[in-house]
């Protein structure tokens, strides 16, 4: 039930042996037939929980997802945590009470949803992590980009523009596994230049919650240090 016009990694986790199978595929409408999830039934209720709809990036995802799901007869209920994990937990509980069939979650913090998602699973609700990994929880699907490759491409572009000099590394939220994979990919490319003394890393910090304000403050401090 996930829409994305990109190449993604689909990780299916079986309930018994917790084996992970990574399948690279193009997702244009739904990811149901080849997974443990059934196809959408007419009238299926989907709870779409977004981390922060104040950001345009997530607004576009919401619109594309909702359009595709409703075209197949599903009903989508969307809520935004606006960057607050406590709010998101309450919203998940609300979706459980509403009796949704599927939860699609962009987690604000993918490490603290285990208890509330256990409640969802007890009610027979399918749980999908979208773009960001949900850890320490029994989820049915995880759909994301090849985040390590994204990080490599970022670093390659920077090295093409500035092959020598001082670099300040700014990461996203330390609670988001994507940010860590971005950094892994970046370092795959940057480390040889660092070892060769072409690049000097003068700072390495992370912006909690992907906060633009936090990132601005960190960078301003870095530039004036």
Regions found by a protein language model. Give the residues of each.
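N-terminal regions encompassing targeting/leader/pre-sequences
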Residues: 1-2
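A residue-level marker of the well-folded mature domains of exported/periplasmic proteins
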Residues: 5-16, 21, 39-225
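Gram-negative bacterial Sec-dependent N-terminal signal peptides
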Residues: 19-38
């Amino acid at each position: 039930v996930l829409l994305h016009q990109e190449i993604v990694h689909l990780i299916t986790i079986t309930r018994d042996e917790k084996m992970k199978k990574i399948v690279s595929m193009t997702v244009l409408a739904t990811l149901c037939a080849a997974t443990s999830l059934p196809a959408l039934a007419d009238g299926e209720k989907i709870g779409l929980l977004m981390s922060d709809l104040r950001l345009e990036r997530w607004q576009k995802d919401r619109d594309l997802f909702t359009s595709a799901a409703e075209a197949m007869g599903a009903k989508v209920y969307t809520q935004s945590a606006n960057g607050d994990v406590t709010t998101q937990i309450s919203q998940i509980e609300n979706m459980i009470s509403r009796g949704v069939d599927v939860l699609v979650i962009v987690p604000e913090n993918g490490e603290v949803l285990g208890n509330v998602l256990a409640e969802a699973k007890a009610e027979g609700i399918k749980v999908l992590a979208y773009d960001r990994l949900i850890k320490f929880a029994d989820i049915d699907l995880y759909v994301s980009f090849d985040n390590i490759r994204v990080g490599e491409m970022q670093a390659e572009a920077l090295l093409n523009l500035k092959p020598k000099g001082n670099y300040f590394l700014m990461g996203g939220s330390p609670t988001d596994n994507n940010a860590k994979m971005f950094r892994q990919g970046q370092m795959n490319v940057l480390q040889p230049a660092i070892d060769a003394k072409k690049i000097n890393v003068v700072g390495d910090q992370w912006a909690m919650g992907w906060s633009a304000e936090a990132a601005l403050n960190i960078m301003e401090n870095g530039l004036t240090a």
